[in-house]
UniProtKB/Swiss-Prot annotation:
GO cellular component: cytoplasm
Keyword Membrane found: no
Example of a GO MF term: unfolded protein binding
GO biological process: protein folding; protein-containing complex assembly; urea metabolic process
Protein name: Urease accessory protein UreE
Native source species: Pseudomonas entomophila (strain L48)
Residue pairs linked by disulfide bridges in the UniProt entry: none
Pfam families, alphabetized: UreE_C (PF05194), UreE_N (PF02814)
Function: Involved in urease metallocenter assembly. Binds nickel. Probably functions as a nickel donor during metallocenter assembly.
């Protein structure tokens, strides 16, 4: 079985594709079937969402696959009014909903209760099948910096 262990940024040859829904693209350890039917495994660094278009390689770099975001059941909100779109993003984010944000568009995994809430804000919602590429903040668990250092200071225990 092929085991993909690392992300790469470019490859001379891509030997296959791997189409996954977002619920699988958040996992770092996973048994998968490539689009050509070959069995494979993912043993990747934890805490990173796989994006459509990313390349994965096995240990020696002979096998390289391109990840594709599978079409899945999503709710899509399209709106030319940035204020209305921002209000919807605020309310969805307040519910910790993984959210894809693009100019004039919000997308989340289909949920009729959330659809009703967004419609209540005055927006139209389309239920459709489309690739879902949420903001990584909902899944990112790796440490991150802010461009400056913070020394660790132990606070005194409460008495």
């Amino acid at each position: 079985m092929i085991v993909f262990t690392r992300r790469i940024t470019e490859a001379d040859t891509v030997t296959g594709t791997l189409t996954l829904a977002v619920d699988s693209r958040i996992k770092s350890r996973l048994r998968v079937t490539l689009d050509d039917g070959r069995e494979a495994g993912l043993m990747l660094e934890r805490g990173h969402l796989l994006r459509g278009g990313e390349l994965l390689a096995d240990a020696d770099g002979r096998q390289v696959v391109r990840v594709l975001a599978a079409p899945e059941a999503v709710s899509t909100v399209r709106c030319a009014d940035p204020h209305l779109l921002a209000r919807a993003a605020y309310h969805l984010g307040n519910r910790h909903v993984p959210l894809q944000i693009e100019p004039g568009l919000l997308r989340y995994q289909h949920d009729h209760v959330l659809d009703d809430m967004v419609r209540g804000l005055g927006l139209n919602v389309d239920a459709e099948r489309a690739p879902f590429e949420p903001e990584s903040g909902a899944y990112q668990s790796a440490p991150h910096g802010h461009g400056h250092d913070h020394p660790f200071v132990r606070l005194p225990a409460h008495s």
